[in-house]
């Protein structure tokens, strides 16, 4: 044993940890004994000899390479990979290889100050005995984020930004002349002008926009958007272009289209919706047992020329973003809320899929057509559910005419029956049933949440969902299946025409096994192998068995993680979750750019056009998939913000809850009354030292053997509500 300069005795483990940290901090460098002893302050002969012995063992393990009798360097494996860096708030950063392999741990000291989403090149360290696999970032290839959002702190000689979220791990220094008028307490957007290096560890930036005072609702929502690089302002030149659009529907244009203005037509949307991009028409065909159901979609691309300034902006945004209290539209307001919105009693241009269906919702014939419609009525989902669940006489006056609103309730009931038939067949074919409840808020005029609740799937939402699914599937089959033979080629030997598909791969087998391990201790079963149909039916049975239990949310969450993410691609592999061989997004061009691409391709091919450039469309698909994920992350952050804001005035109050998650650092608890979730940290679990039993998802007291397990009922007290960090902290109520 040696002695440290402070008199503390050094043991082998301590010296090994010191050496490991030193060599990892200098990857690729040769360090001499003299440098090592000086850096680690190993001044005594016993301490130096202990360090030499440990380095010899590390070399024997291939973790170090011996350069000479008095020098070593870190042994980096020759394997070099590129991929994405993922930063975590708990310090457990990782590297995700491009080849789809498992994430690899990256210690903070080996991260080269990489941020989440950065493209990096790494080298792998030789793996020490009983240690996890680690990677070292050797080069940052591309920065994902060059802007940060946070709170300004202005001092006498300098200023800095305390960044929101987990993208940045350090404050950003700002020269006072680069503040753009920002003051202490302001939320601001800062552009990074200098990244950390070996010479300077500081992040330096300049203010590009002052959002306003911290805590203001609009400021905070804009801050969330800015944090993800999403636009919170609409460019004036794009708005001007939208204002100049000619919206006249001429007689010549109507003559080129199928006319549905006298056919019973209506929209069903959320009660607060403004952009109505889909409508349904319904009529019984004369001298036939069939019904005609039209799925009418706003003809957005009729108004937006490909390559125009409006089109380029929509392409860049790729999707509308739905925060808790606002929508950030993909298109200018004049287009999405007025010109293209299928508002009642207004003539509108549509692109439509018209089905002839029998009583059992079997498609006997269909056609794709550009149309003109005039909606008779605008329904909210709640109104439709009331009609469908009511046996009372029709609440609307009837004039007896085909297009009158008096015909609507009977039409709704027939369409509801058909939708349920379509839904049943879909699940029998192997579709996975994820009816997840979504957390929603009632918001007052100041943007403050007054109530939080779960929205559930209803017959009204399912009615719209099933007919939209039918339209999306049908047009995808029209292109993808019609021209293909068994070899994936068209009859003349050429490849099928380029198209945009919505694809969803089969579940990851390892993640299915993880799901099985999670649910097994609670008596649930799930298949991890077999046919696609067998696995999906097993998943559906699991969801059904967990329905209404305290474990429902957890099981749904873990099951969703086992599923691959759906995305856009020109390379079709089908949609596993829906059990469709061909699927696309056709029905929401107001809010999704892929739907605009689909409309353009269908129009081109209907007119006899040649196949579009696949590489170009694949690039657009990749961008759209990426932007969809970014938008979802921003939406989740807005929910977290409102959840913490809702609980901010309830600190000190007690609630019944249940354990919704177990981690090595504490337990997550969901309040039964309002579904808000917070953390009880390990340090707040008094009376024992608790160890994490990862296999059984529980914490176990070392002395008392008391367990905190998933699903357990628990009484909590709200301890802290940190709105800036979007974190809720609970403690046990009996403390």
Regions found by a protein language model. Name each.
Residues 102-107, 168-174, 675-692:
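A short macromolecule-binding patch
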Residues 2-294, 301-346, 378, 385-386, ...:
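Charge-lined substrate channels and their catalytic hotspots, especially those that engage the 3′ end
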Residues 38, 189, 194-196, 213, ...:
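Electropositive polyanion-binding surfaces
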């Amino acid at each position: 044993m040696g002695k440290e300069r402070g008199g503390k005795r050094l043991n082998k483990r301590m010296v090994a940890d010191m050496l490991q940290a030193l060599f990892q901090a200098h990857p690729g460098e040769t360090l001499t004994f003299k440098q090592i002893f000086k850096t680690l302050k190993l001044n005594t002969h016993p301490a130096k000899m202990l360090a030499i012995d440990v380095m010899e063992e590390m070399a024997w393990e291939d973790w170090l390479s011996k350069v000479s009798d008095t020098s070593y360097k870190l042994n980096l494996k020759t394997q070099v990979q590129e991929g994405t860096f993922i930063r975590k708030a708990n310090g457990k950063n990782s590297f995700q290889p491009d080849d789809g392999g498992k994430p690899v741990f990256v210690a903070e000291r080996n991260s080269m100050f990489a941020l989440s989403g950065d493209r990096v090149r790494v080298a792998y360290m030789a793996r020490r005995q009983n240690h996890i696999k680690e990677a070292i970032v050797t080069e940052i290839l591309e920065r994902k984020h060059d802007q940060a959002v946070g709170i300004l702190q202005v001092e006498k000689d300098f200023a800095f930004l305390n960044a929101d979220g987990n993208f940045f791990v350090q404050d950003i220094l700002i020269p006072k002349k680069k503040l753009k008028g920002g003051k202490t307490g302001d939320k601001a957007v800062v552009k990074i002008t200098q990244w950390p290096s070996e010479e300077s560890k500081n992040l330096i930036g300049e203010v590009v926009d002052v959002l306003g005072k911290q805590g203001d609702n609009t400021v905070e929502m804009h801050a969330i958007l800015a944090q993800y690089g999403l636009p919170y302002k609409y460019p004036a030149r794009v708005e001007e272009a939208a204002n100049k659009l000619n919206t006249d529907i001429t007689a010549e244009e109507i003559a080129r289209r199928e006319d549905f203005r006298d056919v019973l037509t209506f929209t069903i949307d959320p009660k607060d919706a403004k952009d109505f991009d889909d409508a349904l028409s319904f009529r019984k065909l004369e001298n036939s047992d069939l019904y005609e159901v039209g799925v009418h979609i706003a003809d957005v691309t009729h108004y937006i020329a490909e390559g125009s300034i409006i089109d380029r902006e929509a392409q860049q945004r790729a999707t509308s973003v739905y925060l808790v209290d606002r929508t950030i539209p993909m298109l200018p307001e004049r287009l999405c809320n007025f010109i293209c919105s299928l508002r009642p009693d207004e003539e509108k241009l549509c692109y439509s899929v018209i089905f002839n269906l029998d009583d059992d919702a079997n498609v006997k014939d269909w056609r794709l057509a550009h149309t003109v419609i005039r909606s008779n009525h605008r329904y909210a989902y709640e109104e439709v559910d009331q009609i469908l669940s009511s046996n009372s006489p029709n609440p609307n006056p009837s004039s007896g005419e085909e297009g009158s609103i008096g015909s609507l309730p009977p039409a709704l009931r027939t369409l509801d029956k058909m939708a349920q038939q379509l839904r049943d067949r879909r699940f029998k074919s192997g579709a996975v049933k994820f009816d997840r409840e979504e957390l929603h808020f009632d918001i007052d005029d100041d943007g403050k949440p007054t109530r939080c609740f779960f929205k559930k799937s209803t017959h009204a939402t399912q009615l719209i969902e099933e007919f939209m699914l039918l339209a999306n599937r049908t047009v995808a089959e029209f292109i993808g299946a019609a021209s293909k033979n068994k070899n994936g080629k068209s009859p003349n030997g050429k490849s099928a025409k380029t198209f945009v598909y919505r694809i969803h791969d089969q579940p990851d087998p390892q993640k299915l096994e993880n799901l099985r391990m999670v649910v097994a201790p609670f008596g649930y079963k799930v298949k991890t192998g077999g046919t696609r149909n067998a696995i999906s039916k097993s998943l559906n049975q699991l969801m059904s068995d967990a329905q209404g239990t305290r474990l429902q949310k957890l099981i749904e969450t873990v099951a969703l993680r086992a599923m691959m993410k759906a995305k856009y691609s020109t390379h079709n592999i089908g949609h596993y979750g829906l059990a469709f061989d061909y699927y696309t997004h056709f029905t929401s061009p107001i809010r999704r750019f892929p739907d605009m691409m689909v409309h353009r391709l269908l129009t081109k091919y209907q007119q006899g056009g040649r196949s579009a450039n696949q590489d170009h469309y694949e690039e657009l698909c990749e961008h759209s998939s990426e932007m969809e994920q970014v938008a979802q992350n921003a939406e989740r952050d807005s929910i977290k913000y409102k959840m913490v804001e809702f609980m901010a005035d309830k600190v000190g109050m007690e609630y019944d809850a249940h354990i919704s998650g177990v981690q090595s650092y504490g337990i997550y608890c969901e309040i039964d009354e309002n579904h808000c979730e917070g953390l009880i940290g390990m340090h707040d679990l008094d009376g024992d030292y608790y160890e994490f039993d990862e296999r059984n998802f529980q914490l176990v007291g070392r002395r008392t053997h008391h367990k905190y397990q998933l699903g357990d009922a628990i009484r909590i007290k709200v301890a802290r509500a940190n709105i800036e960090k979007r974190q809720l902290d609970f403690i046990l109520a009996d403390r």
